[in-house]
């Protein structure tokens, strides 16, 4: 009986022993990560280039946003606006189930894509599928990876180089876009027609034939860069 009692006590101690794998509480870790991400956002001297993809499953493609963060205020520019136009609004970094970046007050350069359009016949309250709240997946001094909270698109921000101005950068992107004025392309292999590629917004709709002549179609998102 004595040995049995010892075994039972040993089992009980194993069953109820919890090991703390972290040096700090989850609340303190979350607070520290919010502080770390906030400092990284503000530390980029010339701001960030955001590769902003729009639409469910990237269905409208990507545009360039430029962002400069400073003490809860963000200044933004975009390839879809004038090259010298900037818009400022409020942002926050907070902890929910993960560390989040949220553009809190209205900034048409980003919120336009997430607001009801009213002109969609099938859904007057439908949006273009753009997020303005993001889970911060990874963050370093040079690169921050985000995931849209609602639509789930992967968004990458890269620290903007200090050797050019925002206006110069956006002007170059606009020139690349203006020079790419063709919207329809034939696909050929060894001189034989194999399909067609149509540009729609910032995507290519690719229609092609396989080796048995069956038609396939897929949408490929893209964005203009310099």
Model features per residue range: what roles?
Residues 10-13:
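C-terminal motif of bacterial Sec signal peptides marking the signal peptidase cleavage site
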Residues 154, 158-226:
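Preference for solvent-exposed, low-hydrophobicity sequence contexts
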Residues 43, 66-75, 97, 136-144, ...:
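Short, solvent-exposed coil/turn segments at beta-strand boundaries
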């Amino acid at each position: 009986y004595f040995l049995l009692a010892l075994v039972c006590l040993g089992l009980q101690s194993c069953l109820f022993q919890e090991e703390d794998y972290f040096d700090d509480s989850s609340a303190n870790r979350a607070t520290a990560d919010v502080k770390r991400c906030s400092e990284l956002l503000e530390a980029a001297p010339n701001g960030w280039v955001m590769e902003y993809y729009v639409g469910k499953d990237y269905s409208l493609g990507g545009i360039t946003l430029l962002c400069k963060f400073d003490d809860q205020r963000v200044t933004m520019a975009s390839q879809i606006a004038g090259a010298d136009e900037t818009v400022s609004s409020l942002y926050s970094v907070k902890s929910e189930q993960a560390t989040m970046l949220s553009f809190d007050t209205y900034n048409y350069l980003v919120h336009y894509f997430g607001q009801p359009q009213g002109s969609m016949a099938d859904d007057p309250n439908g949006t273009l599928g753009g997020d303005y709240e993001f889970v911060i997946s990874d963050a370093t001094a040079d690169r921050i990876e985000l995931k849209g909270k609602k639509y789930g698109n992967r968004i990458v921000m890269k620290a903007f180089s200090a050797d050019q101005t925002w206006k110069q950068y956006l002007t170059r992107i606009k020139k690349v876009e203006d020079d790419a004025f063709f919207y329809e392309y034939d696909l050929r292999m060894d001189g034989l027609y194999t399909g067609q590629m149509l540009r729609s917004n910032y995507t290519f709709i690719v229609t092609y034939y396989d080796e048995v002549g069956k038609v396939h179609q897929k949408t490929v998102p893209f964005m203009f860069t310099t």
